[in-house]
C-alpha cells in the first residue's frame, strides 16, 4: 500500500455512556455529525480520551462501526486499537480494520517498559497484520517510557504502513529530530493542544486534539492558519483557547472534557471507574471558562 499523508485537525473522541454505564450510541452519532459540520479532518474513537481501557473488545468494535457508518466518506476514521500485549494489540488492530477503521492509532506498550527494540518489534508485528495506516502513539506521561525518535524513524523507513506518529511528549528536541529526519510521506502530529502553534511552526502536520471535542471549528481554524503560514491569526486563536487547553487536563483526561460536553448538553456526565467526577472547585473553573468562550450561558 502507499501511505496516506495524515494531517489537519483530528479529534480524540470521547465515549458517551448512559447512567446504566452502557455505551450511548445515539450520543456518538450526534458527536460525529457535530464534527462533520465543523470540518474536522479525522475522527479517532476508542483512544485514551475515549476511555478505551474500560471498553470491552465488543464495545470497541461497535463504536468503530457506528462512527464509520455516520462519518461515511466525509472524514477519515482512525480507531484507537492498542495495548501492552503485542498479540492482543494485533487482535484489536485486525478487529478495528474489519469494523471499518481506515487507519489505526496504537498506543506504545505501557507498564512492561520494553526496550527500543521491543517497541520496534511490537509495532512491526501490528503493521504486518493489517493493511491500513498505523499511527504510533508515543505518550510517555501515561506509558512510563519513551519511544525514541530513532525507533520511530526506523519504523517509518522499514514498515510501509507505519504512516504517522502522535507525539504526545513535550520533548522538543525529540520533536525537532522527528520533523527534520522523517520520510516525506510520514506524518508527525502533536497530541498536545497547547503545542499546536509551536509544533506546526516547526513543520508538524497537525493535532490529535482533546479540545476539538468542544470547539472543533476553532481548532480546525488554528491548524489551517498554521498550514497557511498566518502566524498572527493563529496566535489570536491560540491565545483565546489556551486556558481551555490547560483546563482540559486539570484532572485526568477525559474527565474535564466530558464534564464540559455534559454542560453543553451533548452527553451525560458519566464515567467508568476508576475515573470519577471532577472536584467541585474544578467544575467551577471549567464552567467559568466555558461561559467566557460562549459555550454555555
From Swiss-Prot:
Tagged with keyword Cytoplasm: yes
Biological process terms in GO annotation: diaminopimelate biosynthetic process; lysine biosynthetic process via diaminopimelate
SMART domains registered for this protein in UniProt: DHDPS
Major localisation: cytoplasm
Subunit structure: Homotetramer; dimer of dimers.
Protein name: 4-hydroxy-tetrahydrodipicolinate synthase
Source organism of the structure: Chlorobium phaeobacteroides (strain BS1)
Active-site annotation: 137, 166
Cysteine disulfide links: none
SUPFAM superfamilies given in the database record: Aldolase (SSF51569)
Pfam family, one: DHDPS
